[in-house]
């Protein structure tokens, strides 16, 4: 029986899990959670995930409610090697650091940038918030100074989460290729990965939503 993923395509963390599953060749049973209708706050969903967030993974008796934890779990359980989430302590620590950077900085920046448009009927991202996003891009540029990927020379689940967040942020606060050439090149490398295409439908949906909000 395929693992069940409760998700929504607009969500960067949900798309990060889809990217990981695609990279691993895992078939998931997808269940869309309509946040606009409050489906994430229904009692049956809260029993699975009291935090009422997406994504949530159910694999047999196992329930996991954070995208980074889900991706690490999928690699450990289903991958034939450890390339996407290395067992080496130093390499794994670097991947973990990048994942925490996504949680604390990048995805948090996305939420802060999107909230005024989605929930407060604003037609633009506040300048202070946009400045914080640019600062996040600056951190990422530094991570890529000596490496092809965000946690070293090989692609990892850190890239999947960060790419899902950055490509979404780029819709709200575009990445300046002159200021951030390494981030720009990294996005291009990511998009050339065959399994990265699973990020595109949700990203296109996000572009349409943002376009309507800014109109």
Ranges and model annotations:
Residues 8, 34, 157, 202-206:
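Short, solvent-exposed turn/loop segments enriched in Gly/Ser/Thr/Pro and often Arg
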Residues 1-3, 211-215:
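Eukaryotic N-terminal low-complexity, Ser/Thr- and Lys/Arg-rich leader segments
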Residues 98-192:
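GST-like fold's C-terminal all-alpha helical module
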Residues 82-87, 108-110, 150-153, 196-202:
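Short, hydrophobic secondary-structure boundary micro-motifs
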Residues 1-128:
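GST-like domain detector, emphasizing the conserved glutathione-binding G-site
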Residues 65, 90, 178-182, 198:
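Alpha-helix N-cap and coil->helix boundary residues
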Residues 192-210:
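Charged/polar, low-hydrophobicity segments characteristic of intrinsically disordered regions
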Residues 75, 165-166, 200:
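Active-site-flanking alpha-helical
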């Amino acid at each position: 029986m395929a693992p069940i993923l409760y998700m929504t395509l607009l969500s960067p963390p949900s798309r990060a899990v889809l990217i990981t599953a695609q990279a691993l060749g895992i078939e998931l049973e997808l269940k869309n959670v309509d946040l606009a209708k409050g489906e994430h706050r229904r009692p049956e969903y809260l029993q699975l995930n009291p935090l009422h967030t997406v994504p949530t993974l159910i694999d047999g008796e196992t329930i996991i409610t954070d995208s980074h934890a889900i991706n690490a779990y999928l690699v450990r359980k289903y991958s034939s090697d450890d390339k996407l989430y290395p067992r080496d302590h130093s390499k794994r620590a670097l991947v973990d650091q990048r994942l925490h950077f996504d949680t604390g900085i990048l995805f948090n920046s996305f939420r802060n940038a999107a909230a005024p448009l989605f929930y407060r009927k604003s037609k633009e991202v506040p300048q202070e918030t946009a400045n914080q996003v640019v600062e996040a891009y600056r951190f990422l540029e530094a991570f890529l100074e000596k490496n092809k990927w965000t946690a070293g020379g090989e692609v990892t689940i850190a890239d999947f989460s960060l790419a899902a967040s950055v490509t979404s942020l780029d819709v709200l606060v575009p990445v300046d290729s002159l200021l951030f050439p390494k981030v720009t090149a990294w996005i291009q490398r990511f998009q050339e990965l065959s399994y990265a295409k699973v990020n595109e439908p949700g990203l296109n949906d996000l572009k349409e939503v943002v376009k309507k909000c800014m109109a």
